[in-house]
């Protein structure tokens, strides 16, 4: 079928692009004895433009008739898409509008909505094992849509805060008061450890303690950083301890919204995969 063939071509090209970026440094090292690294800039500039057409195809897959490749109930889906576009546009405006953020949210929510509509439009809702097997492809698409929303929010709408603090200082993070409690140093067998302790939301009786620090390895003269992470259902907050200057410690705080949606989407896709395997 034309739709499935186009989707297959997109994912083949995506796989080959990732494979090229992975093995290219190895080829260069073998042929020219030079070491290079292929990182984020390559994958962001090549994989993402290829993935977007794939996700666009996925967004219309639930509403296609696989016998005729025509859209079923087109008026219903067009109306739903227009309403969703307006809602996402309003939401993006209040989240500091960003073009990629708008595209990502619209794509993710549309995949979710189209899959849900397809489930309720195409099948009689009878909760049994056969029902879950029949709707399994749509469930997988819902998982992808949720993951897209999580990836978009955590990358595009990330908020970064910088502070210069003394021990005992209080500062505000996302409307919550945080106490920079103290700095602790310890000597381990092969490294020296520096730990900054933070108390999050100290206005409540049950404040949460977060540790962020650095390790210094004298033999290799290498310093590694360990971020303190506060997990919440709608965001992850990262505390990063920097260097000390003029008796003040530099502290960076990153707020990544809806990281949990990425994991939720992956779990749903894993569930869908297990159901698909069990059918064989």
Task: Locate the predicted segments by residue.
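Accessory, solvent-exposed terminal regions and/or long lumenal/extracellular loops of proteins
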Residues: 85, 136, 145-280
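Hydrophobic alpha-helical membrane-insertion segments
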Residues: 9-19, 143-147
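Single conserved hydrophobic/aromatic residue that forms the stacking wall/gate
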Residues: 1-7, 11
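Residues within alpha-helical transmembrane segments of multi-pass membrane proteins, especially transporters
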Residues: 17, 24, 53-56, 63, ...
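Membrane-helix interface motif
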Residues: 19-32
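Short aromatic-rich membrane-water interface segments that cap or initiate transmembrane helices
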Residues: 8-9, 35-51, 252-256
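Membrane-interfacial entry segments at the cytosolic side of transmembrane helices
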Residues: 4, 71-79, 97-102, 127-143
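Membrane-embedded alpha-helical segments of integral membrane proteins
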Residues: 42-123
């Amino acid at each position: 079928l034309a739709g499935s063939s186009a989707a297959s071509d997109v994912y083949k090209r995506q796989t080959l692009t990732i494979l090229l970026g992975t093995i290219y440094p190895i080829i260069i090292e073998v042929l020219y004895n030079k070491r290079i690294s292929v990182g984020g800039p390559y994958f962001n500039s090549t994989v993402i433009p290829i993935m977007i057409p794939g996700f666009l195809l996925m967004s219309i897959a639930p509403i296609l008739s696989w016998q005729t490749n025509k859209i079923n109930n087109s008026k219903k889906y067009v109306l739903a898409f227009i309403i969703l576009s307006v809602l996402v546009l309003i939401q993006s405006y209040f989240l500091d509008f960003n073009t990629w953020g708008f595209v990502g949210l619209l794509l993710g929510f549309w995949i979710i909505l189209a899959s849900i509509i397809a489930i309720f439009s195409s099948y009689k809702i009878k909760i049994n094992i056969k029902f879950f097997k029949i709707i399994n492809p749509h469930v997988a698409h819902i998982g992808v849509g949720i993951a897209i929303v999580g990836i978009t929010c955590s990358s595009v709408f990330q908020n970064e805060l910088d502070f210069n603090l003394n021990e005992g200082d209080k500062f505000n993070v996302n409307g919550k008061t945080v106490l920079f409690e103290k700095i602790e140093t310890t000597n381990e067998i092969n490294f020296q450890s520096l730990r900054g302790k933070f108390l999050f939301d100290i206005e409540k009786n049950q404040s949460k303690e977060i540790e962020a620090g650095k390790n210094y390895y004298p033999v290799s003269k290498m310093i590694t950083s360990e971020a303190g992470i506060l997990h919440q259902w709608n965001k992850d907050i990262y505390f990063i301890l920097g260097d000390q200057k003029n008796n003040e410690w530099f502290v960076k705080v990153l707020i990544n919204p809806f990281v949990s949606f990425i994991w939720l989407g992956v779990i749903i896709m894993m569930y869908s995969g297990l159901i698909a395997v069990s059918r064989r």
